[in-house]
Amino acid sequence: MFEINPVNNRIQDLTERSDVLRGYLCYDAKKERLEEVNAELEQPDVWNEPERAQALGKERSSLEAVVDTLDQMKQGLEDVSGLLELAVEADDEETFNEAVAELDALEEKLAQLEFRRMFSGEYDSADCYLDIQAGSGGTEAQDWASMLERMYLRWAESRGFKTEIIEESEGEVAGIKSVTIKISGDYAYGWLRTETGVHRLVRKSPFDSGGRRHTSFSSAFVYPEVDDDIDIEINPADLRIDVYRASGAGGQHVNRTESAVRITHIPTGIVTQCQNDRSQHKNKDQAMKQMKAKLYELEMQKKNAEKQAMEDNKSDIGWGSQIRSYVLDDSRIKDLRTGVETRNTQAVLDGSLDQFIEASLKAGL
């Protein structure tokens, strides 16, 4: 005879958790908005404005992730209760096991939705930019920056996010001096925002003929893409705009016109640049979009002392603002904020970052 009380208790628990999420995630409002978005997307002229149509499509996906999951939870829990009744009446262990398996799947789905509660920031659902900057230390630090770039690109790929290299500065011997990556996908900024900080590498350097141990630093800075309708005033007199020739690996010119654009916001010292298009006009638009996003992030940080302190330390790539230590000799990677640690260093460098990211989000960092 199978034990039914623990299963009924689980159903009750999942029902209560689901009801809490319905309130917290504004289920009714989202369901109503989903109907509105679907109606707009069914209009024959919706693609006359491609950018708006794409934005509506993205919004629909985000709304469906909440509405459909909660609908499936409600129906699924009713179905499991029905299966349990059948199992008890027929004394059928196979039906009972089927009900338990369905309950396990529902619990996993609910846990994923509960995790999204941590993405409550205004721009958590937005696409984002990731800046990686090599610290002092020459080739070793530049190679480390390149390893971080690969790690984040692999991580983004594993989550189905789209990535685009906006600007990249090659290292003199190996690696990169800096790179800006645009990462697009559902809650891209929410997922990555706690990765801002300094990453420390300790290893026997392949660039040292003596095979000595070296410590290198590189920084990551994550900021959301800001909607064009956000009111951020930028005084043109505060900007210095430089154009230059875009160059690729090995110094080869991508083209012979000065299409690359660098914009400096003089009061803050913030710099953005773009060279990924042959059109100077498009590169300037992209660099301005990044500038707007960075200035928005700066304003948000001024309202938050902890984030502001991190921004103040951003230029000082050293011991003070470290978030994670990668000690390859000892096969150990440790997050200095949450204490999460792993010895599978290669998996992490290949993009397996979720254990660190999830722990930092759950800790409210």
Swiss-Prot record:
InterPro entries: PCRF, Pep_chain_release_fac_I, Pep_chain_release_fac_I_sf, PrfB. This is Peptide chain release factor 2. It holds the Pfam family RF-1. Peptide chain release factor 2 directs the termination of translation in response to the peptide chain termination codons UGA and UAA. One of its GO terms (cellular component) is cytoplasm. SMART domains: PCRF. The modification N5-methylglutamine is found at Q252. It is found in: Cytoplasm. The keyword Cytoplasm applies. PANTHER family: CLASS I PEPTIDE CHAIN RELEASE FACTOR, PEPTIDE CHAIN RELEASE FACTOR 2. Belongs to the prokaryotic/mitochondrial release factor family. The keyword Amino-acid biosynthesis does not apply. It comes from Escherichia coli O9:H4 (strain HS). Disulfide bonds: none annotated.
